[in-house]
Regions:
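Short glycine/serine/threonine-rich phosphate/pyrophosphate-binding segments
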Residues: 73-78, 124
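Short beta-strand/turn micro-motifs composed of small residues
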Residues: 16-18, 70, 227-229
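Short acidic/glycine-rich loop or secondary-structure boundary segments that cap or lie
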Residues: 147-150, 192-194, 205-209, 233-236
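Catalytic core of DAGKc-family lipid kinases
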Residues: 15, 19, 86-88, 92-200
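Glycine-rich phosphate/pyrophosphate-binding beta-alpha loops
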Residues: 143, 147, 199-212, 282
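ATP/nucleoside-binding phosphotransfer catalytic cores, i.e., glycine-rich phosphate-binding loops
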Residues: 2, 25, 186, 192, ...
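ATP/NTP phosphate-donor binding region
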Residues: 1-66, 76, 80
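Gly/Ser/Thr-rich active-site loops/lids in small-molecule metabolic enzymes
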Residues: 158-165, 208-209, 214-235
Length: 296
């Protein structure tokens, strides 16, 4: 997928999630005005994810440049339409986590504005997820277990943002900590695993800056597969703290490998075990086939 960081097309449309992050609508408009100081761009505050996807597709088919303004979830929606229509997008990270932007070296709004005014183009890695009845993408990582439960709980904590938000969410999950049983198929071989977390990654960050996959881009044509299990509560908490630095991948309970694709099926009846999350959002239920996206 291609991210364009220069606003040079005649028609530019900003699709904005009004609820993303802590910025007010007025503040978001002010930031957008700094990108297009000489023009009055089309700014649309969308009300639903369906509207965001529909409008993105509409304008992309008319060769407009769409700027996704929101968190990882909003950017995910716009990016999926860009992939399906072979379009280019820009981003303004207005969310609480902003892990996809971070993976591109965009660590602030100021940096995002500079990039949109510059001439840099990035061809970005992403994941394809194939469920029984739908297809989705993930720009950062996607998985099951603690990752999914923490992402869900994070949406219920309105006052925090970034890694602190997701760390707190994960700690809440430890109250009823469970390793779930999954059937994992890699390279045609299927094995059952008791896992606390299982994820595929296209880029290094998740959870508002957690360095979950330091080796995400090590192999150009493969995604990073990570999973961990068999940990008691205290050991699991210690492992979580190591995720901030990326040193968790050295823990003996963590399996860190690369593959072109893998399939996960639930072997537990617990509802949490089957929920698949990616880019901080619910994407679907197991079973799922996850592969590295190949379409630019």
């Amino acid at each position: 997928m291609v991210i364009l960081k220069k606003v040079n097309q005649e028609k530019v449309v900003y699709l904005v999630n009004p609820k993303a992050g802590k910025l007010s609508i007025k503040q978001k408009k002010k930031i957008i005005s700094k990108v297009n100081s000489n023009k009055k761009p089309d700014i649309i505050f969308t009300k639903t994810s369906e509207e965001s996807s529909s409008l993105a597709r509409y304008y992309m088919k008319r060769k407009a440049l769409v700027i996704a303004c929101g968190g990882d979830g909003m950017i995910n929606l716009i990016a999926q339409q860009a992939i399906e229509t072979s379009s280019i997008i820009g981003i303004l990270p207005f969310g609480r986590g902003n892990d996809f932007a971070r993976s591109l070296g965009i660590n602030s709004i100021k940096k995002a504005i500079e990039n949109l005014k510059g001439d840099k183009v990035s061809n970005c890695r992403y994941l394809n997820l194939e469920f029984s009845n739908s297809k989705k993408i993930a720009l950062t990582c996607a998985g099951v277990g603690l990752l999914s439960e923490a992402a869900y709980r994070a949406t219920k904590i309105p006052l925090l943002k970034g890694s602190l938000l997701y760390a707190l969410s994960a700690l809440i999950c430890f109250i009823n900590l469970k390793n779930h049983c999954y059937s994992l198929t890699v390279n045609g071989k299927t094995k059952k695993h008791e896992a606390l977390i299982l994820a595929g990654a296209a880029s290094p960050y998740t959870g508002g800056g957690m360095f979950i996959a330091p080796d995400a881009a090590r192999r150009k044509n493969e995604l990073n597969l990570l999973y961990a299990g068999g940990l008691r509560r205290l050991d699991a908490i210690k492992l979580l703290l190591k995720v901030f630095s990326g040193s968790h991948i050295e823990h003996p309970a963590v399996k860190n490998t690369h593959t072109k694709n893998f399939k996960v099926e639930a072997a537990s009846k617990n509802r949490w075990s089957s929920i698949v999350s990616g880019d901080g959002e619910y994407l679907g239920d197991l079973p799922v086939q996850i592969s590295l996206g190949i379409k630019p």
